[in-house]
Amino acid sequence: MYKRQTLRGDIENIHIGEGSNVQDGCVLHTDPGCPLKVGKDVTIGHLVMLHGCTIGDNSLIGIGAVILNKANIGKNCIIGAKALITENKVIPDNSLVVGSPGKVVREVTEEEKKAVWENTKHYQDNWKKYSKSIF
């Protein structure tokens, strides 16, 4: 968790999986019947809005993306910056999604999966390095 996020679990639960990171300016919120679940080793980029959705393991949600109630993002997905994922939308595993509304444009390559993991690992390493001086 970085600075200036808002997590509102006042209506339903919010679960953030081990190794995931939520960057500056994100808002995570729920509605009745719409809990929010973020899987393991997920990167939630700056200024992302997650609302009552599910994000699969090892995914990257790009800067400023919006994902709405009951949307389900599969594992190993990349959601592009500023993408809008509408309510009830199901994104299959290994998908690259861009646009507003978001559309699957192709499968994520092995090289991209590796880059997403390296990005996530970078944030995990930063947490280990700096958390001792922050808290």
List PLM regions with ranges.
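Structural signal for interior beta-strand "rungs" in well-ordered beta-sheet cores
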Residues: 3-97, 102-104
